[in-house]
Amino acid sequence: MLARTIQRFSVVAKRGYAAAAPAANANPEELRLTFASPDTAVFSNAVVKQVDVPTLAGMVGVLANHVPTIGVLKPGVVSVTTNEGTVQRLFVSSGTLSVNIDGSCQVLAEEVLKVEEIDESAARAELDAAQRASGEGSEVARAEAQIRAEVAEALIKAATNQQ
């Protein structure tokens, strides 16, 4: 009886694994950037020279052949240098960075704003309001106010080219 039970359960379904799909235009000698937010695709698999990204671990400069990396974005300016040498500066509030072995890089941000579109006076007003709120209310409200203040400070730095 035990032999039949063991035999019945010894037929285990073998797990199949899919073969890795080849990446489209994979060339680790190129840096392919996808930079997007939920409502905006700034770059879509575009070949660029360099991307500088603010992360919780510090600024990360990404070039072709970069070691695979993941990171969490902090509020600040992402600088994208195209192959032609032009630099595009965009403010991000938060998000993720992923650098892959195939030469691709994804910057997925919660919010993206062109640096030249930042309203410095509105950012200063938000900073003042957040600082006032940081000493009031529940622990959650104080934490939210601290996050608002951090984003407002980063916006002001970006608007005044302090980054």
From Swiss-Prot:
Lineage start: Eukaryota, Metazoa, Ecdysozoa, Nematoda, Chromadorea
Main location: mitochondrion
Transit peptide: 1-18
Name of the protein: ATP synthase subunit delta, mitochondrial
A biological process term (GO) from this entry: proton motive force-driven ATP synthesis
Superkingdom of origin: Eukaryota
CDD domains assigned to the protein according to its UniProt record, in alphabetical order: F1-ATPase_delta
InterPro entries documented for this protein: ATP_synth_F1_dsu/esu, ATP_synth_F1_dsu/esu_N, ATPsynth_dsu/esu_N
Similarity comment: Belongs to the ATPase epsilon chain family.
HAMAP family (alphabetical): ATP_synth_epsil_bac
Gene Ontology CC terms: mitochondrial inner membrane; mitochondrion; proton-transporting ATP synthase complex
GO molecular function: proton-transporting ATP synthase activity, rotational mechanism
Keyword list, A-Z: ATP synthesis, CF(1), Hydrogen ion transport, Ion transport, Membrane, Mitochondrion, Mitochondrion inner membrane, Transit peptide, Transport
Cellular compartment(s): Mitochondrion; Mitochondrion inner membrane
Coiled coil segments of this chain: none
A Pfam cross-reference name: ATP-synt_DE_N
Protein role: Mitochondrial membrane ATP synthase (F(1)F(0) ATP synthase or Complex V) produces ATP from ADP in the presence of a proton gradient across the membrane which is generated by electron transport complexes of the respiratory chain. F-type ATPases consist of two structural domains, F(1) - containing the extramembraneous catalytic core, and F(0) - containing the membrane proton channel, linked together by a central stalk and a peripheral stalk. During catalysis, ATP turnover in the catalytic domain of F(1) is coupled via a rotary mechanism of the central stalk subunits to proton translocation.
